Amino acid sequence: MVSHSELRNLFCSADAVCFDVDSTVIQEEGIDELAKFCGVEDAVSEMTRQAMGGAVPFKAALTQRLALIQPSREQVQRLLAEHPPHLTPGIRELVSRLQERNVQVFLISGGFRSIVEHVASKLNIPSTNVFANRLKFYFNGEYAGFDETQPTAESGGKGKVIKLLKEKFHFKKIVMVGDGATDMEACPPADAFIGFGGNVIRQQVKDNAEWYITDFVELLGALEE
């Protein structure tokens, strides 16, 4: 068991910090917003709830939800133009502070790369530091499925990405920050996990995370000490 003060020290000395995106870096769940935009909100948000609670394997839940939504390329582009995701208060300052300290910041999401890259651009995070699912479209722009080879398409995918980052960049300390069970499961291989409940509180995470925050100000404060 790592003590709270050890966790704080680990966060402050990390050479990489990985953030979940939906309900962590942004206030919304991207897939639910896409479903709402495409007119199938209720059915899809119930599936998301089950997936986040760990009741359904991630890839199966993603396949089912996308089969309902059937988003076209144009719908995704219009969603970003008309209803762009809202950054969670404090995240811009936190990411900026980490980058000033030469900490690598990554976004690891079970959501969609087109949405996550839009978020990354707002935070000055290079697209090479984004790991998310890729939607596939036919040449006419209609939905053609998703890239099932991406690690983020699987249960345990976030842990696979972190393992890959350690192998590639030889990071000594990686911290994962997120709201969901899939984020908590990424530690290990992450060296520490910080639960985030600023947008939605998932009881399983709140009960089991050694360090649980509801405001990014707390992490900013730890860096300033």
From Swiss-Prot:
One of its GO terms (molecular function) is L-phosphoserine phosphatase activity. Coiled coil: none annotated. The active site is at D20 (nucleophile), D22 (proton donor). The modification N-acetylmethionine is found at M1. Its cofactor is Mg(2+). Its EC number is 3.1.3.3. The keyword Acetylation applies. Belongs to the HAD-like hydrolase superfamily. SerB family. This is Phosphoserine phosphatase. The gene is PSPH.
